[in-house]
Amino acid sequence: MKRVLCALIFCLVCVLAVDVNAQTWPSRPFKLIVPTGPGAATDVMARMLADGVSRKLDQPMVVENIPGASGIVAHQTVARAAPDGYTFLFTNTSGLAINLISFKQLPYDPTKDFTAVAMVCNQGPQMISVNAELPVKTLSDLIAYAKANRGKLSIAFDTTAGAAAFGAKLFNRRADLGLVEVPYRSAAQMTQDVASGVNQVMISSVAAAQSVVDAGKVRRIAITSKTRFRGLPDLPAVSETLPGIAVDGFFAIVAPAGTPADIVARLNREIAEYLKSPEIQQRLISFGLATEGAGTPAGTAQFIRNEQDHWRALAQELDVEPQ
């Protein structure tokens, strides 16, 4: 009887401790680590989110930029942080999926070192665009023109956005176009080179191409998401012409593995409320992104696992070897 009583008391203490934890968190400023430098689109989104969450929780969510090494340093930092609810990571497709297949050894485990908190964006497509003087207006036109001029056209992509490189290779090989693949380390330089005709085709984020599209120097012809992007509803998806080709990105919030479930649930609720705002949804669309809401922590974790499986399959198809 005494043992049973002790066990009941222990359980009660644990329940009360969780409840107190949920009520008192956050009692001080907490960090949101961002794997890019200040001013990048990812950083702008993270700061926008942090500002909204800070106001809801009455504590500053402080953005800390840790750029470099394909986001590896930032992810390693969060993976090693104390799971106390005061360190979170604004992560993306590259950090949790593409790095997994791009590097033989990572100093963090994308599948074990993090606790999923919430989705921010589940649609972050790439876009296929062409130099405005190229005599093509649709994806079918481009496919026919490339095959008729095999080896004479090039497709540029930004290697700092891992999804773009995969998208370029997938499109080129599945359609058997024979495009010369030209990697760039700078999206700005890439877009200018396509605008000036150095390269004829590019795959980029919607936002990266916006200025040259607005200037009339580049024509967008297709989007790489599974379905049409809500921000550009008249732009066809690649899959409408080439079924099965889809390259999408995501952004999510994760925490160090072992972060208390009640804290994770609380932050998830606040992010969910924030993302419901039509103004915020419109701002995300201006970045070339879309959201269906924060989802649940469990749903976010499953989404990430599905994405990891998807990118592994793509890497195998494209014979991409980890470095």
PLM-predicted stretches and their roles:
Residues M1-V4:
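Positively charged n-region of N-terminal signal peptides that target proteins for export
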Residues S94-Q105, A165, K169-R174, V201-D234:
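A ligand-binding cleft/hinge motif common to bilobed small-molecule-binding domains
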Residues A22-K112, K152, D176-S205, V212, ...:
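N-terminal (or domain-start) structured segment
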Residues L16-A22:
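Sec/Tat signal peptide C-region and signal peptidase I cleavage site
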Residues S27-P29, R173-L177, A261-Q323:
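An extracytoplasmic/periplasmic, membrane-proximal ligand-sensing/linker region
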Residues F30-L32, G39, A46, V63, ...:
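Residue-level signal for nonpolar/aromatic packing positions in well-ordered secondary structure
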Residues R80-Y86, I101-Q189, V238, P243, ...:
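Hinge/capping helix and adjacent helix->loop/strand transition within the periplasmic-binding protein
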Residues C6-L16:
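Bacterial N-terminal signal peptides
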